[in-house]
From Swiss-Prot:
Coiled coil: none annotated. This is DNA replication and repair protein RecF. The lineage of its organism: Bacteria, Pseudomonadati, Pseudomonadota, Gammaproteobacteria, Alteromonadales. The gene is recF. Its main location: cytoplasm. It comes from Shewanella putrefaciens (strain CN-32 / ATCC BAA-453). Belongs to the RecF family. The RecF protein is involved in DNA metabolism; it is required for DNA replication and normal SOS inducibility. RecF binds preferentially to single-stranded, linear DNA. It also seems to bind ATP.
Amino acid sequence: MSLTRLNIEAFRNIQFAQLIPAPGINVIYGQNGSGKTSILEAIYFLGMGRSFRSHLSQRVINNDNDKLTLFATLNLARGDSKIGLRRFRSGETEVKIDGEKVKRLSTLAETLPIQVITPESFSLLFEGPKSRRQFIDWGAFHADPQFYGAWTNVRRVIKQRNQLLRNGAVYTHIQFWDQEFVRYAEQVTEIRNHYVDSLNGLLKGIIGEFLPSVDVKVSFTRGWDSKTDFAELLENQYSRDLATGHTVSGPHKADLRLRVGNLPAQDALSRGQLKLLVCALRIAQGKLLKQQIDKHSIYLVDDLPSELDAQHRQLLLKQLTDTGAQVFVTAIDPAAIVDSLHTPPNRMFHVEQGRVTVVE
């Protein structure tokens, strides 16, 4: 799968741009503030309906416009597919796939799986478990068609349960919701656990390439003691949940644990090593997607030279090339990317003040 055409209109400082990307490595270069990261962001927005730059997500629409428009043609195994998205200042989003209106943004994610390696994405290991749950759930969503519905039901039940707790409901009023909660929680947990097991099979070899002297153990924690019956736990923890006003244990507390020896990876590794570990996780996830559903991810790699030294840039780009996926990578100086590739990039784009040109 690859993007064969991308139109960007009124997105950040890009008034209008049309790109015809190549299937392999696409290098996008330009000075800071030129708009090169906005191209990656537009691709991500088209696949997720939101920005990966969460602190700037309210300002995606160009100041002179009342809406942004993104359009892409995808080359898929079954033939070409067209995706269009409009976001209005009111917050309304309109999505079409092959001319048909789409109501759920999850349909975008299913159509256009995207992996992001940016300065912000390294928070996967530096911050709390939420981003690591999202990492697991991205893979579980693509790997198992039952996951989305089960996880949607988990969130619905937790919301209802927490409202009852805040209202001081007696346990007999909560018990009905707990029966649903247990059923969906166990389904979500089984899918997540199976996914992490599958990921581990690929991850060990990739981590060995990036961090050959480091033994990283990866495990999944479900959000409650695996030796404890979840229904019994919910009943026994009712008083605690009532006191806090929310559900303390469950799949919404799951985590992906990465350890080196007896220490969390965050404490045992340098910041540079942690960045390489995140890269390994993203590459493993993309490779697993290809194995499971025969679909490539699209990789968006932002400001690579500032994040990794020359040796590790070369290693990452080799790994990305070997996946066979389409890659968009940005830099201020294109030589920092080109010199790290074993073969010339498939296409290069120069960005200046929001204007994009192909470099022949």
